[in-house]
Amino acid sequence: MASRNFQTLIHPSAVISPSAQIGSGTVVMANAVINADAVVGKGCIINTCASVDHDCVIGDYVHISVGAHIAGTVDIGNKTWIGIGATVSNNVSICGGCIIGAGAVVIRDVNESGTYVGVPIRKIK
């Protein structure tokens, strides 16, 4: 199958560090912030007012919802969804295939795919 190269769309009000890397097909919405040396994979959505801080690695097909905040040096695996208003503390890894619920707070590594909610998070599915 032939490889496709999709457009990357960045809203004019988004703030992206010159040292950040953004994959093809990724959409960065209004007032989103992507800071220094962050790497965002292909096909991601960095939604309105979301922030991805320094040195984060965001896998492919990740959705960071409206107002979610990802602190520095966070690693998020492929096909993970971070819910509206969620917070991920610094130096945390989240494996691929996870759902982090709205308003959840992640303060430790997530090593098993599933659905996590609460403050701090707990696995529910």
Please state what every model-predicted region is.
Residues 9-124:
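Structural signal for interior beta-strand "rungs" in well-ordered beta-sheet cores
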Residues 1-4:
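Short helix-capping segments at alpha-helix termini
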